């Protein structure tokens, strides 16, 4: 990543609701892993600008997906897709998207029970208005 410090802050902030934490960091890299475990499962390294990418993190449920998105918006990061169902992926695919400071598309996703899909869609419309009233502007870290 080019914006190493900003990206480290981004990932520490938005992955915490998914129970992923910063395990270690030095001047060149930062490692993240599941809370309560010793291993690193995700690594960012300081580097040159490359092509942006799309990373998806699996959440336990829709509440975690919502919390991921809310944490990012509250911290001033850019929304790239509000929490909600993505029927073009699967009928019960629920996801939210943020842009990291280098422009990569970062997703939290889960599969919800189809019986909850209609209620979730209604809840999302209300929550989306609330989330964007917190921070409708551009990302904070550049």
Summary of predicted features, one role per range:
Residues 2-5, 56-102:
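Vicinal oxygen chelate
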Residues 47-48, 53-59:
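Helix-adjacent hinge/juxtasegments
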């Amino acid at each position: 990543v080019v914006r190493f410090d900003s990206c480290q802050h981004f990932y520490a902030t938005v992955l915490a609701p998914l129970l992923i934490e910063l395990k270690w960091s030095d001047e060149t890299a930062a490692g993240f892993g599941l809370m309560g475990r010793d291993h690193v499962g995700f690594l960012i390294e300081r580097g040159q600008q490359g092509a942006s990418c799309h990373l998806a993190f699996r959440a336990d449920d829709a509440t975690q997906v919502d919390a991921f998105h809310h944490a990012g918006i509250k911290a001033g990061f850019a929304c790239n897709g509000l929490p909600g169902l993505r029927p073009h992926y699967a009928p019960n695919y629920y996801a939210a998207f943020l842009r990291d400071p280098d422009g990569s598309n970062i997703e939290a996703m889960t599969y919800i029970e189809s019986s909850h899909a209609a209620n979730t869609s209604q809840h999302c419309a209300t929550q989306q208005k609330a989330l964007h009233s917190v921070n409708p502007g551009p990302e904070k870290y550049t």
